[in-house]
Amino acid sequence: MWRVCVRRAQSAVPRAGLGDRWAVLKDGPVAPCGSSRAGPGAARFSSGTPSYGVRFLCGWSSGSDTAPRNRLLRQLLGSPGRRSYSLPPHQKVPLPSLSPTMQAGTIARWEKKEGEKINEGDLIAEVETDKATVGFESLEECYMAKILVAEGTRDIPIGSIICITVGKPEDIEAFKNYTLDSAAATTPQAAAPTPAPAPCAAPTAPSAKAPGSSYPPHMQVSAVGEQRLESWKLRLGVHLSERPCLKEIRETAQDSFEVQEEGYLAKILIPEGTRDVPLGAPLCIIVEKQEDIAAFADYRPMEVTSLKPQAPPPVPPPVAAAPPTAQPLAPTPSGLPAGPKGRVFVSPLAKKLAAERGIDLTQVKGTGPEGRIIKKDIDSFVPSKAAPAPAAAMAPPGPRVAPAPAAGVFTDVPISNIRRVIAQRLMQSKQTIPHYYLSIDVNMGEVLLVRKELNKMLEGKGKISVNDFIIKASALACLKVPEANSSWMDTVIRQNHVVDVSVAVSTPAGLITPIVFNAHIKGLETIASDVVSLASKAREGKLQPHEFQGGTFTISNLGMFGIKNFSAIINPPQACILAIGASEDKLIPADNEKGFDVASVMSVTLSCDHRVVDGAVGAQWLAEFKKYLEKPITMLL
């Protein structure tokens, strides 16, 4: 619906700037749609408010200009009221929420550079969330005037301004030296400075839930401007009908804040009376199902670090202070900077080439915009022979310092958000879940024969793999032994009535577990199709959150690498994970002339949470699993 509103403004004043379009949206004859439901744009872009989709922002409120939705519409359209008066009309683009659990993101790559034209639907940047790398698109035609957050900047809070766009190319030059700090200094409000808003928090320091904890599907409602929260109109557990008054906030006037979808209020994160609630601060949690409320009793929003890029480590002070009249130890090579006084600006390609060639970027003079080092600088760089001289001309004797390692000895790989989440969840699992392991050998002879026949029948339509049989057998075994299809929920053990099998998939970004939903009622052909589609989307980083969040049982298969057996780590809050090894030909006793047969035997290991699944129960599950694979015809019963 947001796309519709913008298009209406553009059609009314096609050559107008963003500020003029704002006026049309607010007062003109073509008003925004007042529906509370989303149009096609909602699936393509989330607003700059954390976990607050476009569909929640559709329409112009009949209240004052400071009504929450109106204020955010004004911010996203770049109205004059939200810009510096000395600058042309422009739009401050905030970091959007790109996944239900996203609290902060990393700019993986800017797809548009400063000065470039951005067409409607163009990809602006790729953002690394806590789950995947996701791109977000522009909803209207504009120009990239200024990038405020450099590539690779980590832990950017949702709602933080990341770039500036303008409607006219001639306005780009005005933002050449634009920064968020300078913008604050030139706004009228700067004349009456106010104390910096304190972080919005409960009176006592929250004891955050263990890192990596998972929660049912939910929506995190966040502040759309600096506010004072006056009162909550609804209490925990109350059912929210469409567009109820949720809370009252105070800024220049007292307004009510509405939600646009049904649900249940599961958690209030900001108490009544809290002052200076900053933009993007999480206010409350809303869930779709009433039974999910209890899961958020100890929910705390994830803390994020400052928006500013991490500064390089400070240069250590000299070992011995030189006299005031002392001369430099050695002249700096001609044409080279004396040394970095801060961050070295370098393009991603140049940085990669420098690492491969062992080139010290501090010795390279950049010829790109504002001294940025580009590929041409790396290609033309010639190491100076005089460079080692400073090492020989040491300062007066002092404590010895270990020499720096030679270039190219190692590479520090930054930890991605996905890798950080994997580390947190696996650490939590090994430290808090009492694992035990059960192994068994399975004769795969019958499965291989059935698979061969089925693939002949499906020739040209796809193939069924051994892994598809394993998924189906696991799902049916979970129906027979439901304790293995359960979840530890701290206060209760949740026994699931459907089997959603998570399948571990290795991707360049890390491990992810897309889900085959309702595997117990799906046929082998459908399971095979689902697995191929999910694995492809996982490797391309195109999985949607609902496709990998949840699951009741997990399978990890390393048999294709020749691994005979291994023990997998449980994926909380699930109770079991099945590790699949490679199949091997083994001799087994047989009632024939030779007295033996050669069988393809596969070794599997079931990791169980002893809080949920006792040893005998785990053994029963493996017995059922083995029966289904050794007699695959029983899967039809």
From Swiss-Prot:
Tell me what PTMs the record reports for this protein.
Delipoylated at Lys-131 by SIRT4, delipoylation decreases the PHD complex activity.
Q: Where is the composition biased (Low complexity)?
A: 201-211, 322-333
Q: Where does CoA bind?
A: R451, S465, S556, N557, G581
Q: What is its EC number?
A: 2.3.1.12
* Positions where Phosphoserine occurs in the chain: S99
Q: Which reaction does it catalyse?
A: N(6)-[(R)-dihydrolipoyl]-L-lysyl-[protein] + acetyl-CoA = N(6)-[(R)-S(8)-acetyldihydrolipoyl]-L-lysyl-[protein] + CoA
Q: How is the cofactor bound?
A: Binds 2 lipoyl cofactors covalently.
Residues modified to N6-lipoyllysine = K131
Q: Where is this region: Disordered?
A: 80-100, 189-219, 307-340
Q: PANTHER family from the xrefs?
A: DIHYDROLIPOAMIDE ACETYL/SUCCINYL-TRANSFERASE-RELATED (PTHR23151), DIHYDROLIPOYLLYSINE-RESIDUE ACETYLTRANSFERASE COMPONENT OF PYRUVATE DEHYDROGENASE COMPLEX, MITOCHONDRIAL-RELATED (PTHR23151:SF90)
Name it: Dihydrolipoyllysine-residue acetyltransferase component of pyruvate dehydrogenase complex, mitochondrial
Q: What is the lineage of its organism?
A: Eukaryota, Metazoa, Chordata, Craniata, Vertebrata
The protein's gene is named: DLAT
